Amino acid sequence: MQFQRLRLSGFKSFVEPTEFRIEPGLTGIVGPNGCGKSNLLEALRWVMGANSAKAMRAGGMDDVIFAGSGARPARNHADVTLTIDNADRTAPAQFNDDPILEVVRRIDRGEGSTYRINGREVRARDVQLLFADASTGANSPALVRQGQISELIGAKPQNRRRILEEAAGVSGLHTRRHEAELRLRAAETNLSRLEDVARELETALNRLRREARQAEKYKRLSSEIRAVQGAVLYARWTEARDHLERTTSEATAAARLVEETARASAAAQVAITEAEAAMPPLREEATIAQAILGQLAIQKDRAEREAEAAAAEFERLSNDLSRIDADRAREAQAKDDAAAALARIAPELEEVRALVAAAPERGPELAAVAKAAEEARAAAEAAVEQLAARVAAEEAQGRAAAARLSEAEARANRTNRALEQARAERAAVGPEVDPAAADARQRFANAEAALAAARAALEEAETARVKAAEQEAQARQLARSVEDQLGRLRTEARGLAQLTAPRSKSGHAPALDSVSPDKGYGAALAAALGDDLDAALDPKAPSYWGGAEAPAPVWPEGAEPLAPLVKAPPALAARLSHVAVVTRANGDRLQKELKPGMRLVSKDGDLWRWDGFVARADAPRPAAVRLEQRTRLAEVEAEIDVMAPRAEATTIALKAAADRLRAAEDLLRDKRRGPPDAERLLTQAREQVAKFEREQALRAARAQSLDDTIGRFEAEKVEADAALGEAREAHAAAQTSGDLQPQLAEARQAAAQAREAAGAARTALDVETRERAGRQRRLESLERDRADWSKRAEAAAKRAESLEGDRVKAAAALEAAREAPAALQEKLVALLDEFAAAEARRAKASDALETAETTRLNADRAARAAEQAAGEAREKRAALVAHLDGARQRFAEVASAIREQARMEPEELGRHVAGEAVAVPKDAAGVEAHLFALERERDAIGPVNLRAEEEAQEYAGRLETMRSERADLSGAVTKLRAGIEELNAEGRERLLAAFDVINANFQTLFQALFGGGQAELKLIESDDPLEAGLEIFACPPGKRMASMSLMSGGEQALTASALIFGVFLANPAPICVLDEVDAPLDDANVDRYCNMLDEMRRRTQTRFIAITHNPVTMSRMDRLFGVTMAERGVSQLVSVDLSTAEKLVAA
């Protein structure tokens, strides 16, 4: 297979449809940094099935879609198409019928990628296998991205093995082996499950055999139980007959006891009435005595609290007086301390002032002396620096002049030799122009125009098809949405119609169906009429509205009559005329003004009736719900009337859109047949033009290069001659300089003396400044202390004066508080006497009431005992009556059960049981116990499978079938394991064969690149070639053999390049992309690199694409394409000549 062209649309920076032709030989791609050259390589990897966003330099796969620029909006999809020539029929079987394969990958934002081969949608794995079988793919080592050489150098041996696998063509084997292993694991899992199922069937078969034995025992016990059940029935009938006779006699005795206890209970009630009549006067006296006692207790508690408060107030005032005396003493002490401090500060302050006034002002004099000494020091040091600089400059000038003279002479000689050689080479090159080139270009232009027209027509057809598909999808979505909405409305309408259908059992329509309130008043109407709305209007109904005359009521202000707000039949007019609507806030207030028959409601459903009844809105009202349902039904039916025509219109629009889509697809199929013929003609014309352009470009490039070289060498010769003259003059001047060393020594001695004098002057000035500043700071500190103590003395005097006034007030309040406790104590004593008298009165009244209560309680207990006895008698009689009824019913039920179950009368059953041979007890309990024992034994068996025998036979047949299937599956597992071993063996054989070939090629290419030396590849880390790592050992000329990690950067790059090209020679891939592989190489190595490219082109059918910035590499290409970004953020692909390529790179 051969790659022919790559077409991009909306991929990264290639927003416009762009086609890149992949021709035989060497194709170069040039352009400035950041213009999108590497996007071509990433598009090729992407269309071959790359699934890593990181490998695409993207955060997510949606990032490969054009994200927009300043002038262009973002796209929502991107697609890349790779056209492959399959004339040799080497594609997989499902695609091998077509001579041309067109692989398309399309991604829609947020929806993922789809793959198509010749228009048929396929899986990503199918695309990956297609390229893997051709020894290429998204991760092929033949696609060398930026930095991949460095990654190969730094890769682990295990990771390097991948290039061997690609060269050996075992990448597809890996995938097939993985699929076989998956099938093997699935088969082993199925085998394990089959064995589990077989074990389960064996267990189930054993269980069914046990169940068959249990079923046999179950049948035997059931037969015996049926024989005993007749004896149980007869024993129950005998007991029921005897129980009926006993209960009849007990009921007669209980009736006589009820009459006696009723008379005793009536006498006890008379005693209770007499005792209760004597108690009200005693209760009144006890209440009065208790009230008086409570009032006196309150007064006593108040007096006690007042006495305690007076004592506490006296104590507080005493404490305040003591505190004031202590504060006066403290302020007096503070005043004395301030006076003492002021007396101590005054003499010291006068002394410091005298020192400050007496000290002479020597600062300016000393500052002037220090300044003069510093100026002298600076002048001396400046003189030393000037002399030292002159000495150093003269020495340096002498050395530099000699070096420049030698260098200028050598440069002039080199320039003259190079200029002569370049002129000789330029004379040998002459421009030649082929007249046939113009005809070839015209044919190429015509073919290109024809292809552009065919593609434009195809693009228009594709656009029309996409547009039609979008319109059809929109129409389908709209039709589905309208249909769904209409269906929901119709479903809701049917449900509401069922809920609101008349529910009267008599068949008469309720009044609710004839009532229609205004919007928002449904809850008010339901609150006003409630369940009365379910009554009919037909007089023949069990409950109906007959209508009545009623005067119109007068409503209070704020109430609005409900009748005008409701459409209702005349029969409801009287009821509605007595209902008004109010707000919830006014309902409670206006309810008091209602007359009989009137009621108020709110819009929320609250109800206020004239008789005081109130029902809030949250109370459930079925009538309100039905009114809301009827209102919603009317709204839904109106919406259905609107939606039905719209649904019909969308259906018609969908059919029209589908017709347009089919027409667009037919047109697209017709237009797709046009571009292939035009492309074949264009390919032929392009090859002829490319041949002429290559020859002319090589000649022009060589001539231009030599002209530029001659011009550069002539300019360099002029510069070299001028530099030689200047160097000679500078060297002569440097020899005439004098000796300045004695002057420099004298200047250094004078500078040292000036520094000593300046230091002494600065020291004297600093001492004087510090002493004067210290005296000034001490003076300021003493003045601040004197001011502070003065303020303290004034504040203490003011506080003492204030405290004196507080003490006078506190003494007066204390004197007044001395008399209050004694007066309050006398009041408390008087209240205690009154409290004792009231307590005695309350005790007397309580005793009398307690005696009366005791009498009433005794009578009550006697009445309750009599009533209890009467009740017990009645209960006993009722119980006996019930027992009698139960005995009669039980006797009848047992007799009926005998007739139903045994088909005979009880007496006949007794004779039948007596004649049975079954040994059972004589009493009913014993017979039932025996029956219970038999039933318990049967129940102990548990659930019984009566079909166990048939199921056991069925399970035995299934088990035999499953054993046969297990044998077949075991054979399949053995075959899969053998197949995997065969794949592994084939992979090892092919990998070792490829290793030997690649190793030999690598050694040959290494020696060609380095001009000698040795190199070899080794498999390490495992004896199995499929698991081993690949290590590179190399020995450039003049060095020892070592691993590649110990070589220099340039040597590593050349060695890695030799390995990559060695892979090509072993199993050439259809395409090789080299993204700036020559970037780390110098000019000599770039030339070797290009020679190797020429050799690979000669020896293989691989088509090489080199992305480069190197002019040498450009000049060795068969054709050049440029990637530009004239519009910010948008890449364009153009054909260029060599001079244009150099300008692009310089940009």
Curated annotation (Swiss-Prot):
Induction: Induced during early S phase. GO terms for molecular function: ATP binding; ATP hydrolysis activity; DNA binding. Disruption phenotype: Mutants show abnormal nucleoid morphology and DNA segregation defects. Mutation also causes a cell cycle arrest at the predivisional cell stage. Residues 497-517, 760-790 are annotated as: Disordered. Its main location: cytoplasm. Keywords: ATP-binding, Coiled coil, Cytoplasm, DNA-binding, Nucleotide-binding. Residues 173-221, 288-327, 365-496, 646-698, 743-880 form a coiled coil. Homodimer. Contains large globular domains required for ATP hydrolysis at each terminus and a third globular domain forming a flexible hinge near the middle of the molecule. These domains are separated by coiled-coil structures. Required for chromosome condensation and partitioning. This is Chromosome partition protein Smc. It comes from Caulobacter vibrioides (strain NA1000 / CB15N) (Caulobacter crescentus). The gene is smc.
